[in-house]
Curated annotation (Swiss-Prot):
It comes from Lacticaseibacillus paracasei (strain ATCC 334 / BCRC 17002 / CCUG 31169 / CIP 107868 / KCTC 3260 / NRRL B-441). The gene is rplI. Binds to the 23S rRNA. InterPro entries: Ribosomal_bL9, Ribosomal_bL9/RNase_H1_N, Ribosomal_bL9_bac/chp, Ribosomal_bL9_C, Ribosomal_bL9_C_sf, Ribosomal_bL9_N, Ribosomal_bL9_N_sf. PROSITE patterns: RIBOSOMAL_L9 (PS00651). Belongs to the bacterial ribosomal protein bL9 family. This is Large ribosomal subunit protein bL9.
């Protein structure tokens, strides 16, 4: 029996996938528990429509990410962060990705999730640092972060 998986089933199939499974397994387990539904012509056309909608949303997210990348990588976009520092330009504390995301939002009204900022280690010194932001799979932007001494 052909079924359309409505949820991920370990070892059998992923959500949205159409697969051939034994009749008893499909009727007694998958369909009863709501993990899959029978692959009728109506269900197949609904699945195709849903996949087209998801592809459209994905394309919109990609164009939005590309526009954000252009805005971020503009030469004038330099995120300035003030922090207390010692004699040898070393900071008291550090600048984590959360602080960079907040400064980017405050200075340029660009909202970026702190988990998308690829910062191997927090910034611990004054000056310029290039930081990579993963906006979308395959679309990365570089932010210039300028840490200046707070007086």
């Amino acid at each position: 029996m052909k079924v359309i998986f409505t949820q991920d089933v370990r070892g059998k199939g992923n959500r949205g996938q159409v697969k051939e499974v034994p009749d008893g397994y499909a009727e007694n387990f998958l369909i009863r528990k709501g993990l899959a539904k029978a692959a009728t012509p109506q269900a197949m056309s609904a699945l195709r429509g849903q996949q087209r909608l998801e592809e459209k949303k994905e394309a919109e997210k990609k164009t939005e990410a590309e526009a954000m990348k252009a805005k971020i990588e503009d030469d004038k976009t330099v995120v300035q962060i003030q922090s207390k520092a010692g004699e040898d330009s070393r900071l008291f504390g550090s600048i984590p990705s959360k602080q960079i995301a907040q400064a980017l939002d405050k200075q340029y009204q660009i909202k970026v999730d702190k988990r998308k900022i690829d910062l191997k280690q927090p910034i611990r010194s004054l000056g310029f640092t290039n930081v990579t932001v993963n906006l979308f799979p395959g679309i990365d932007a570089r932010i210039r972060v300028h840490v200046i001494e707070q007086k």
